[in-house]
Amino acid sequence: MPKIVRFHKLGGPEVLKIEEETSKQPGKGEVRLQVQASGLNRAELMFVRGQYLEHPKLPAGIGYEAAGVVKAVGPDVDKNWVGKSVSTIPAFSMNDYAMLGEEVIAPVAALGEYPAKLSPAEGAAVWMQYLTAYGALIAIAHLAKGDFVVIPAASSSVGIAATQIAKAEGAISIATTRKGNKKAELLSLGADHVIATEEEDIVARVQEITGGKGARVIFDPVAGPFLEKLAEAAATGGIVFEYGALSMQPTPFPLFTALGKGLSIRGYTLMEVTRNPEKLAAAKEYVYDRLGDGRFHPKIAKIFPFAQTVDAYKYLESNAQVGKVVITVP
């Protein structure tokens, strides 16, 4: 029987268990995927802890991103999908579909093909990161040549995707990381500037880099008290995206700074893209084209075998990585 990852109580990575499950047949609008690799995301850790946008229905599976081969399709699904190498797009609830396992059921609407030159591990590191960054930076902010964009948590897979998008559009990226030990690697990955926020004054550095104007776009997954500094670093009329809560602290609204600068501070998740068919089609085309011509390339931080799933999530939680943590599935 195929193995899947499941948890029966809330907690950290240690509550995850590898269990056997009877093979399932896909229903209407579904496919069965033989998984080759799975990309890990912080949203999944928040889900396991009961801190995500949706609460898990226990016992629950886990996982948004898998790459593999379609082995079977539902009664209303085009049979041409069978045999194709695909990866999954986070366009569903993990209470309905969970992608971390040897064999999974996925909605056909959440499948995306990836260029043949990518490995399954790289294919599992595409859609969450690039679609999250695309939706905010391109679809909403219309990032353009010469724009300054601040990218906190820049060593994450989404942060690296945002840096690559900025480079492709001719914008100037200001990556931030807590300490200076990741600076050289972030610069090598395309960041134009890197600020170590525990060692430097982010507001002063952004003002210096932008010639006193501030950044028009800020793409932040941290929130908490850090938002006040980001608002100070923003340009007049700038837009601040809050797409995460890594700090897990209360997030005071910087009212007077927002009023004085006319800032737009908005919450954002990639579901704004993935649950709208027209937006998703445009996003997939944008990402696929740039993967194909080499402007985008997933950065893999570390690969773990399926049996070490708990260790893989602990590594993700350590913040030691630069790029995507991936699990390979036998």
Task: Identify the residue ranges that each predicted region occupies.
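Glycine-rich phosphate-binding loop and adjacent beta-alpha segment
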Residues: 95-97, 177, 225-295, 328-330
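Short amphipathic alpha-helix with an adjacent loop that forms part of the alpha/beta core around
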Residues: 201-212
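Mid-domain Rossmann-like dinucleotide-binding core that forms the NAD(H)/NADP(H) cofactor-binding site
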Residues: 124-200
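N-terminal Rossmann-like NAD(P) cofactor-binding module of classical short-chain dehydrogenase/reductase
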Residues: 87, 150, 218-219, 241
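NAD(P)H dinucleotide-binding glycine-rich loop of Rossmann-like/cofactor-binding domains
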Residues: 79, 88-153
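Glycine-rich beta-strand-centered segment in the early N-terminal region that forms part
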Residues: 22-39, 51-92
